[in-house]
A protein has these predicted regions:
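His/Asp/Glu-enriched short active-site or ligand-binding loop at hydrolase and phosphoryl-transfer sites
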Residues: 70, 195-218
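Secretory targeting signatures
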Residues: 1-26, 305-335
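A short, structured surface patch at a secondary-structure boundary
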Residues: 44-99, 103-109, 114, 207-210, ...
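A ligand-binding cleft/hinge motif common to bilobed small-molecule-binding domains
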Residues: 110-120, 234-253
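Short helices/loops that flank or line small-molecule/ion binding pockets
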Residues: 91-101, 116-121, 221-229
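Acidic/histidine-enriched, beta-strand-rich ligand/metal-binding domains
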Residues: 213-216, 224, 237-239, 247-248, ...
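Solvent-exposed loop/turn segments at secondary-structure junctions
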Residues: 52-56, 72-75, 90-92, 103-105, ...
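Extracytoplasmic substrate-binding proteins
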Residues: 26-28, 35-39, 45, 102-103, ...
């Protein structure tokens, strides 16, 4: 073999067996907490500390690299086979250390003390907070940058933008925008106000948040609810699910006589939304947006079919997040 041919052969072998090492250039990223990290090599093992992060990781085709998730991570189904490393603020550091990940994708709700401790142990911890549509795009691209899947991330974001733009185009010129309440509980009446993820989805779907005057997530009185009189009421799947699989939060709007005068109740316009897609800033938010557009404007988008009850579909254990709100310790999540 000629020397030049031998040299080329050696290069080809190196390309095959050392491709990842040769093809990776260290990247510097600043996460949503403002912390700067340098990813020296392409991660081969990943721990996700939030359901939203987990969905993004799997959407990018990185499921086989996941070695740890939270007990609230439930999508895709393969996630249920992964080692759990605790909850949000109750992450189990020992289990994370045992998994020995190359990178950890965290959420602010994991607690700054936990995040700082993991960093002191030498782990690359990237904090992601996708609390808006644009924030979701950024989160997907951040994970893509950190894992060498930029092309896949860009493709997902492009598809999401195309689908959202299609909704916006169909709503051009529409002036009838129903008033919408997103209810998380009754007594107290917890609602999604302005500056919330749900408020943005309601607006994009051609509606008006009935409680836009409430900042963030907050409680409104019965009197305010009756006076505001939303045309459409949304509740999350899994919210206070009964043992028979019925959504007791949805049912309570129809059984509480004090609410019988509400327009949404009289017109039976109280809808169940898939909480895993409606409350998580991941790739599937477009599904909820398309469904919400059907609810608000069936004359344009067709009729809406409510999701299967959480009693028979996987993964509504994330509802403890809502329970945390009701208890006064709001853990918004999903993420």
């Amino acid at each position: 073999m000629k020397p030049v041919h031998l040299f080329i052969a050696v290069l080809l072998v190196c390309a095959v067996f050392c491709g990842t090492a040769l093809g990776w250039n260290p990247v510097t990223v600043t996460d949503d907490s403002g912390f700067e990290s340098i990813i020296e090599s392409q991660p081969e093992t990943i721990v996700s500390l939030a359901p939203t992060n987990t969905e993004i990781i799997f959407a990018l085709g990185l499921g086989d690299k996941v070695v740890g998730v939270t007990e609230y991570c439930n999508y895709p189904e393969e996630t249920l086979t992964k080692q759990t490393v605790g909850g949000y603020s109750t992450i189990n550091v020992e289990k994370i250390v045992a998994a020995n990940p190359d990178i950890i994708f965290a959420n602010p709700k994991n607690g700054q003390e936990n995040i700082d401790y993991l960093r002191r142990l030498g782990y690359s911890v990237i904090v992601i907070q996708s609390d808006s549509v644009n924030g979701t795009y950024d989160a997907i691209q951040m994970v893509g940058t950190c894992t060498g899947t930029t092309a896949e991330a860009n493709s997902i974001v492009s598809d999401m933008k195309t689908r959202i733009d299609a909704i916006s185009e169909k709503l051009e010129g529409v002036t009838d925008k129903p008033t919408v309440m997103h209810a998380m509980s009754i007594e107290p009446y917890w609602v999604s106000g302005s500056s919330t993820f749900q408020n943005e989805l309601i607006t994009l779907a051609g509606g008006t948040n009935a409680f836009a005057d409430v900042e963030g997530w907050g409680v409104v009185t019965l009197e305010k609810l009756l006076t505001t009189d939303p045309q459409i009421i949304l509740v999350d799947s899994g919210s206070k699910m009964g043992t028979t699989g019925e959504n007791t939060l949805q049912k309570s709007f129809f059984t509480d006589q004090r609410l019988s005068s509400l327009t949404a109740v009289r017109n039976t316009d109280v809808y169940v939304m898939n909480s895993d897609t409606f409350d998580r800033g991941g790739p599937r938010i477009v599904e909820s947006l398309e469904q919400l557009a059907q609810i608000l404007h069936p004359e344009i988008f067709g009729n809406y079919a409510e999701p299967i009850s959480s009693a028979s579909s996987p993964g509504f254990s994330v509802i403890p997040v809502i329970s945390g709100i009701i208890g006064g310790l709001f853990i918004y999540r999903r993420k």
